[in-house]
Every structure is written in C-alpha cells, then in structure tokens.
C-alpha cells in the first residue's frame, strides 16, 4: 500500500512517499506554499502518479503536546486534502521531526547541504516512517 506524507509549513511543504510492507519512506521534492496554501495542481499530479491509499499530514505540536499557532493551519491543510481529493487523511504527531531531519542531514552530509527544502522532505520521511511503525492500517 502506497502512502504519501506531508510536513506542513507556511512556505514549504515536505513530501515523502512510502510503502507499508517495507515501512520506509523516500523524500520527494518539497512543494512551495504561500501562507500554507500549496499549488493544488502539484498535489493532484502527485496523487495521480503515486495513487496512494492514504495521506499523512504531520501535526505540529509543542513538546508538551499543546497546540501551536500553526497546528490549526495544518489541520485545515489535511481537511482540504480530504475534501479536494476524496482520500482519507491521517494526522500524525510530528514533534521533533524537523530537529531529527536536520540531525540526519548534518550527520550524512555536513553543514553545507543543510538546506531548508531538504529538511522539510526528510521530516516528511520521518513522519511517514513513524506513522507506519505506529499504525495497523
């Protein structure tokens, strides 16, 4: 079963695709956004190419589990995905995914490649793999 995950952001939205049997994700190109709103045609094309069974959207929360200002916008993004494309969307706790993504990129390639667009897509991989490991589908 193919699943696509999103690391929601106001300017960039990280994207990853994965398969539940392997429980592994692969980073795709990030999507540009304006105040959290992506080019919906780009998402439509992603869904057409990959034909996922589900979508997963990272839910940004504070370390103590409380909501952030961006939490509601991520929930709205998830709602719009479900509404526009008639596909089930899971919200998944993404606490520390960006920090973990930065650490992985830095360990692998050093500071020079620590670019924001890569961080979002690697964070989407972390969100997706975490979702695979915590769900029975």
From Swiss-Prot:
Entry EC no(s): 3.1.-.-
Organism, scientific name: Buchnera aphidicola subsp. Schizaphis graminum (strain Sg)
HAMAP family linked: Nuclease_YqgF
Ranges that cross the membrane: none
Localization terms from the record: Cytoplasm
Record-linked Pfam families: RuvX
Gene3D superfamilies the record matches: YqgF/RNase H-like domain
Main location: cytoplasm
SUPFAM superfamilies: Ribonuclease H-like
Keywords carried by this UniProt record: Cytoplasm, Hydrolase, Nuclease, Ribosome biogenesis
InterPro entries: RNaseH-like_sf, YqgF, YqgF/RNaseH-like_dom, YqgF/RNaseH-like_dom_sf
Family, as annotated: Belongs to the YqgF nuclease family.
Protein name: Putative pre-16S rRNA nuclease
GO biological process: one example: rRNA 5'-end processing
Protein role: Could be a nuclease involved in processing of the 5'-end of pre-16S rRNA.
GO MF, any single term: nuclease activity
Annotated Gene Ontology cellular component terms: cytosol
Top EC category: hydrolase
């Amino acid at each position: 079963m193919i699943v696509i995950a999103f690391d929601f952001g106001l300017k960039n939205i990280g994207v990853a695709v994965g398969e539940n049997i392997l429980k592994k994700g692969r980073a795709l190109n990030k999507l540009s956004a304006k105040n959290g709103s992506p080019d919906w045609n780009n998402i439509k094309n992603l869904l057409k190419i990959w034909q996922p069974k589900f979508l997963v959207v990272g839910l940004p929360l504070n370390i103590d589990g409380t909501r952030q200002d961006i939490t509601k916008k991520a929930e709205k993004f998830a709602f719009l995905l479900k509404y526009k494309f008639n596909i089930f969307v899971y919200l998944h706790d993404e606490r520390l995914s960006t920090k973990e993504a930065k650490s992985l990129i830095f360990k692998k390639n050093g500071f020079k490649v620590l670019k924001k667009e890569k961080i979002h897509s690697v964070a989407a991989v972390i969100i997706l793999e975490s979702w695979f490991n915590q769900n029975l589908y």
